[in-house]
Amino acid sequence: MKLHELKPAEGSRKVRNRVGRGIGSGNGKTAGKGHKGQNARSGGGVRLGFEGGQTPLFRRLPKRGFTNINRKEFAIVNLAALNRFEDGTEVTPELLLETGVISKLNDGVKVLASGAVEKKLTVKAHKFSSSAKEAIEAAGGTVEVI
């Protein structure tokens, strides 16, 4: 193989389709916009959600629910993520933040039971699922709600 025999990967060099450049191009004259009408005009087209004057779907459906301004957002930590720590480590929210297990503290840390924990750890968090609590204690560790 020589340099002049190299070919780009199939589909990596797509040629831009220039419309409105002569009838022979297959996309001349109306440039793929059809004849007249709103969509053929410059700046033409209907707004998002417009259904030709029929009451649009988003207005036919009722409003539902509300946003709770007192909502608490917990940073989630699964048991599998706790295995990176050494036996006997005291796992605190600050340590989890430092080691990159969580990216933000939010309103606290909640430990969930996805995966298994094989180390004996002291875990301090704001909330625990009941199965996570049992799993940590079954591994010989302790659980402390902050």
From Swiss-Prot:
HAMAP family per UniProt: Ribosomal_uL15
Protein keywords: Ribonucleoprotein, Ribosomal protein, RNA-binding, rRNA-binding
Signal sequence interval, chain numbering: none
Source domain of life: Bacteria
Name the record gives this protein: Large ribosomal subunit protein uL15
One cellular component (GO) term of this entry: cytosolic large ribosomal subunit
GO molecular function, one term: structural constituent of ribosome
Similarity comment: family membership: Belongs to the universal ribosomal protein uL15 family.
Organism ancestry: Bacteria, Bacillati, Bacillota, Bacilli, Bacillales
Gene name of the record: rplO
PANTHER family the record matches: 50S RIBOSOMAL PROTEIN L15, LARGE RIBOSOMAL SUBUNIT PROTEIN UL15M
